[in-house]
Amino acid sequence: MGGKQSTAARSRGPFPGVSTDDSAVPPPGGAPHFGHYRTGGGAMGLRSRSVSSVAGMGMDPSTAGGVPFGLYTPASRGTGDSERAPGGGGSASDSTYAHGNGYQETGGGHHRDGMLYLGSRASLADALPLHIAPRWFSSHSGFKCPICSKSVASDEMEMHFIMCLSKPRLSYNDDVLTKDAGECVICLEELLQGDTIARLPCLCIYHKSCIDSWFEVNRSCPEHPAD
């Protein structure tokens, strides 16, 4: 008899594409449940999405079950590219995405195929595809040394500063040109006979006034910055 009543209660029919599984309805007073929304079968398979996994839906992150952020990798490539959230209500065989070792935080967030996402507080780099993120970090994590103007990796910053500050100031010998010597690469004007020049240890020559101004912001040879 109870079975007939249950059937009659659902006689109006479900919404198209929505599971009628009673387990998809959270129990009163219980923890939030991650229900399943089915996409009509076929190659697309099961589409699972957490109702508390999207920021901005009006749910309090502190009561949303602590949906974890981090790395999500596809366990099967046979399904579509739809969004899937961690902690689906189905069994392990129902879930096409497995949660890897990632950051554990509270709050809303979502993920896409092969992406690292840490929620609304994350930066652009956090949401980059995993195969692009290392290249992005390597090109953005360095800095330009204010002493020698060389680009230095972040993990070498301290050692580089010690070497730069302990390195003696580059010196030069002044002289007067006895003949024209081409172009000064600092001011891009000709080095003419009679000009006062500075000759560096690497034998590069510049106008003395030009190299003095250069050394105020950079302690290396303009043409040999690695020396």
Swiss-Prot record:
Keywords carried by this UniProt record: Cytoplasmic vesicle, Endosome, Lipoprotein, Lysosome, Membrane, Metal-binding, Myristate, Phosphoprotein, Synapse, Transferase, Ubl conjugation, Ubl conjugation pathway, Zinc, Zinc-finger
Tissue specificity remark: Expressed primarily in the nervous system, with expression higher in developing brain relative to adult. Expressed at low levels in testis and thymus.
Result, substituting S82A: Partial loss of binding to 14-3-3
Involved pathway(s): Protein modification; protein ubiquitination
Single Gene Ontology BP annotation: positive regulation of autophagosome-lysosome fusion
SUPFAM superfamilies assigned to the protein according to its UniProt record, in alphabetical order: RING/U-box (SSF57850)
Region (Disordered): 1-42, 68-105
Pfam family, one: zf-RING_2
Chief subcellular location: other
Reaction catalysis annotation: S-ubiquitinyl-[E2 ubiquitin-conjugating enzyme]-L-cysteine + [acceptor protein]-L-lysine = [E2 ubiquitin-conjugating enzyme]-L-cysteine + N(6)-ubiquitinyl-[acceptor protein]-L-lysine
Domain of life of the source: Eukaryota
Listed PROSITE patterns: ZF_RING_2 (PS50089)
Membrane-related topology note: Peripheral membrane protein
Cell compartments where the protein resides: Endosome; Lysosome; Membrane; Cytoplasmic vesicle, Secretory vesicle, Synaptic vesicle membrane
Location of region: Required for endosomal and lysosomal localization and myristoylation: 2-10
Gene Ontology MF, one: ubiquitin protein ligase activity
Positions of post-translational Phosphotyrosine modification: Y103
Modified residues (Phosphoserine): S50, S52, S53, S123
Spans traversing the lipid bilayer: none
Lipid attachment locations (N-myristoyl glycine): G2
Zinc finger (RING-type) in chain: 184-225
Enzyme kind, highest EC tier: transferase
Entry keyword annotation includes Metal-binding: yes
UniProt remark on domains: The RING-type zinc finger domain is required for E3 ligase activity.
Job of this protein: E3 ubiquitin-protein ligase that plays a role in different processes including cell differentiation, receptor recycling or regulation of inflammation. Mediates the ubiquitination of AKT1 and GLUL, thereby playing a role in neuron cells differentiation. Plays a role in the establishment and maintenance of neuronal transmission and plasticity. Regulates Schwann cells differentiation by mediating ubiquitination of GLUL.
Protein name: E3 ubiquitin-protein ligase ZNRF1
